[in-house]
Amino acid sequence: MNQYIQGRFYFLFLSIVSGLINLISQGESDSQAEAIKMGEISVSANRIAKETFRTPNSISVIEKSQMERITATITPQILAETVGILAQQTTVGQGSPILRGLTGYQTLLQIDNVRLNNSTFRSGPNQYLSTIAPHGLDRIEVLRGPNSMLYGSGAIGGVISVYSHRLNYRNDKKFSLVPLANLRFTSAQSGRVGMLGLHGGTNDLAFFVTSSVRRFGNQKLGSGYNLHYNNRKFEIVGDKPDPLPKNSWIKKDEEPLGWSGIDATAKLGYKINKDQQISFCYQTWRQPELNRYDKISTKEYELYQFSPQNRNLLYATYESKKPIKFIDEATVTLSYQQQLEGRKQIKATNLNEQKEQFDEVGTFGLSGQAVSTSLPQQRIIFGGDFYLDRLSSRTVKTNLATRIEQVDSDWGRFPNNSSASDLNLFAQSEVEVWSDLQLVLGGRLTHYDLQADLSSRDTSFGLYQKSGQALTGNTGVVFSITENLNWVANFGTAFRSPNLNDTTVVEVTNEGIDAPSLDIDPESSWTLEAGLKANFSRFIGAATLYHSEIRDLISRVPVKEAYDGKDLPKLYKDIQLENPDTEIFIQDNIDQTQIRGIELSGTVVLNSRLTMYGHGTITRGRILKNNGEPPNPEEFWAERIRREAPPMGMIALQWKAPKKPYWCKFYVRGAMEQRRLSRGDIRDPRIQGKTRDPKLVEFDENGLALDAGTPGWYTLNLRGGVKLGQLVRLNMNIENLLNRRYRQHGSGISSPGFNLTTSLSTSF
């Protein structure tokens, strides 16, 4: 951006801000301003409801009203405006939150306290949070930082807890019935979403039912073009190059990206008596097919689809107050979750063969916890959980000329009949040392098992079995400097056991093809964080500094590099023979990795009508040691972590007059450039550049890539809503007013250009 355009942008922004403040504050005194409170209640930080201001953890809570105003089409998009989160998208209809430099299986996801993660989750960004529809949610809690002590394996980067619509019991026996409806339209994707729901009940019976359907078209981008190279890399350019570079092509919009889906949720609750209740929930998601754009745009594949992406969840929860003398409350949940994922591929070099792989994971879960305040000045939470995965996997190859199918029932992406399980016991104590000082202490013991038979592909690999134990802990401090200002600190350890994706998968990735890797160790980490939390009448906010070190971080290594000078096993040779133009990778442990960062967020009430909100995040990662040695200082990429988030943030001004049915919001989102690239980033077709060879990338003296990486970006946006009578709400969101073309770091698709989203909701 030249200085003239940049100057105009800042002048426009400051003019809008000044105009809003002057217009809205006319005739008002400070005494008329409404007070705000840090009334956010979180469950995920302590596995029991507690005010976030009084916890040592870094937590964000997104309430139902906020989600309705954001008008997201998939659940990960709701998190894009949350401090500390980079909402990556490999393709449309999918999204993966990156917390503190980690994503995929290093971030734990759960729905209604039932674990969503299973043993097939991969290391990079995945699509599984998108299988929870944004309609019918009550709130989302984001716990940043390690919490294996409460949630077990995988909670290294953080925990994202999604809660479905709560059951509402009446105060009397009269039966109530409330219909719900929502229509949503988006212009940039020609998207349509429709939802119908029903909730009601009596004083001892409550239910909630909702279902939605959605259909989206191709994605319209901002001004400019995508310039693709035949080495699978690309760049965003403002004008068409004339002439085009050799072996390159131009794309104005990104297609084919149309997709559709359907979901449904049903909940039923019954109060047995005043101290006991039981609830049941069924949830389903159906996504018939979805194109993976970064595989198609590179012309590597003629067809690459997730087909299908389905999920079913059924659980029952029993809750009891005072079941025995020293227990205040207890909860037990029994669950079964089924996830079916299919991949459909046609390579550009072999148009006569279609390859389909189907992986179905059935997960049985049992969890329970109890809360006791029988000891003076403390609250104890203890419990355990058990999860068991059973995997069915197969491959179907079809000759498109003859329509003859060849079925391999022994192996899809994984060996058929593989299994994984983990058993956990935990306890945590909150101790009030005195009125201004609170300590939180806890620990968890985990035992895990993996089993897979690889002998059908290579008898030398045979039956793979791995088990182990881990002990993790947590210590937190909350010190009240004043009634409205807390100093908090937290030290926690976390771990992640290798899963089936680490050890047994044969899968196409953005770098090449992953192959089985049996000789890897669990990841472990420790994190120290400290900061301030403010809760004043007209300002709430938080500032957090953190430092993490991860031992044995699992990362890809080219198989030829790992077996340098040695003969490759038959399995690897066979995979290479099937994919002669694709590099094969296995997993290995990185000795020591460091991630540091700062997270800032705050809300200020300027007067009774105008509120300002903002947040910012900086993340820095570094590999300290690998194979017993520090990285080569001349190879800048060797010390970088994968997908390090750029400095990013948001600032917003919201106007809402007291007792008025309408509101509006102007906000700016953006990120600085990210040119701190790892070897995997340089090879990744989703990250801009001209070459996939790190040795051909130019770097400056600070180790920043000069001709690769993600440029900085910002968008100007408007959002508003009005209540039409007592039953109908209309919300509108205008994104990317300047129609800029940009892509989030690590994403496989560009973000929409000028985009109008309209949402019409009613509750009869």
State each model region's role.
Residues S187-F216, Y225-P288, N310-N312, S374-Q378, ...:
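Transmembrane beta-barrel wall of Gram-negative outer-membrane proteins
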Residues E255-W259, K271, D275-I327, Q338-G362, ...:
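Flexible loop and strand-edge segments within Gram-negative outer membrane beta-barrel domains
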Residues K271-N273, Q377-I381, D385, N416-R551, ...:
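Structural signature of Gram-negative outer-membrane beta-barrels, strongest in the C-terminal barrel
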